[in-house]
Amino acid sequence: MRIYRVKPIAWTDSSVALLNEYGATLCTPDREATPLDLPEADEKEKSPPTPRLLPPNAAPSKNPRQKHCRDRLARRLEKCENGAEKKTTKEDTFMLILVVNAGSSSLKYQVRDTSLPEAEQMLTSGLVENIGTDVPNHEVAFDIMSERLEPVLAGRELQAVGHRVVQGAEKFTHPTLLTEEVVQQIDDLSPLAPLHNPAHAQGMRAAMHKWPSLPQVAIFDTAFHSTMPEEAWRYAIPYDLADKYSIRRYGFHGTSHEYVSHVAADMLGIARDEFNGIVAHLGNGASVTAVKGGKSVDTSMGYTPLAGLIMGTRSGDIDPSALTTILSREGIDGERLDTILNKESGLLALAGSNDMRKVVEAAQSGDERAQLALDMTSYRLMKYIGGYNLVVGGAQALIFTAGIGENSGDFRKLVLDRLGALGIKYNEEENAKRSPEPRVISTEDSAIKVLVIPTNEEKAIAEATEELVKGL
């Protein structure tokens, strides 16, 4: 029988519970055990008696996972002093999570240590570009990324991978552990997200090939919006067509909307499941979401990310008949029309630039088209905010997030100046400031709190990945 030596320590109920957690066997002098010569403690330390630790089976397991548990147990036992276990340290609880966003031509990544304070969690981030040209495929991209990570990890091992996925449809409404079957199902949803899901699936297969024993989790942008009622997600088209082609409102940016709404609720001292608010995610892609009881009940993007607000290069809402007119009279096909609506419209079409900073500067210099673009964009957002205030039964907060929402006080002012009818009042000095910290910019007497909260989708993905993996 193999006996494991452990350092003589004082044993308490917490120590015994720790051993039971790992399925180990305690042998004290009043239980039968093979004798083991242990160093004698000083007379003052002889009580209580030192137990001896035996493995649960006579023969030691060669299973590396069990060995890991024994080693981890031994380390934690050494931390017991004066009959009590020390508080678990960051070193004991660290979880290194790789967050990836695999696109068709790029691989964005970030490594986070979720045991550290939020400001210190991000260890590194980067981008591998030109996949399909200079970089042959996603497997090579993951190899390049892995080489870059080696000096950062410094011998530590990743413990999980979290993958961002744009479209989960009705199939995936929660973080999901990846298997070959799950990856294929994500790939099968490509008709709903042809620019994203095929690349996500390729990235997942490459990651699973590189780290076959590492838990990998998919986090879906659409999942947060799966709680929308049917009156919000169904389109008024024949049921057979809607069902045949899965045509409905899905919504996007869900990871950001959920994360920011949670931060807002915490800031205001409101239980997350009681929070009613409106989140405006304003970047090159933009969407606004109505949150009621902590859940998404409506959102501006629809079947694709094209619907809703005017964006950097996307048109947002448009009468479908205008599209059939363009198709027939211009003699173009659907693919060309899709390119026009997604890549040649929005601010770019109206003002000649998809960069909000340049559009604001042009408007301030007297450019009438730039001013019109700002007026149209803020007007469209104002309409959604006003409507969603009714949807949630009176918002407790309006939140601005993402690149424009966080950094453009000029655009926030354009929007907020339109919302006086809702009783919204804001502090112009606070609004003009730029800060990486979440903050309230409304006045004390504002009917609705106005917040600016930096989004952190990578943090949200890492936390969701950790939660699922720890439950395995």
Q: What residue ranges belong to the model's regions?
A:
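Short, Lys/Arg-enriched N-terminal segments with co-localized hydrophobic residues
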Residues: 78-94
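Conserved phosphate-binding/catalytic loops in two-lobed NTP-binding clefts
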Residues: 409, 413-457
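Short beta-strand-loop/turn "lid" adjacent to the catalytic site in phosphate-handling enzymes
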Residues: 149-197, 215-217, 223-235
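Phosphate/ATP-binding catalytic cores across multiple sugar-kinase/actin-like superfamilies
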Residues: 260-264, 375-393
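A mobile "lid/hinge" subdomain adjacent to the ATP/sugar-phosphate binding pocket shared
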Residues: 329-373
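Short glycine-rich, Thr/Ser-proximal phosphate-binding strand/loop in the N-terminal lobe
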Residues: 97-136
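Glycine-rich phosphate-binding loop of actin/hexokinase-like ATP-binding domains
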Residues: 227-329
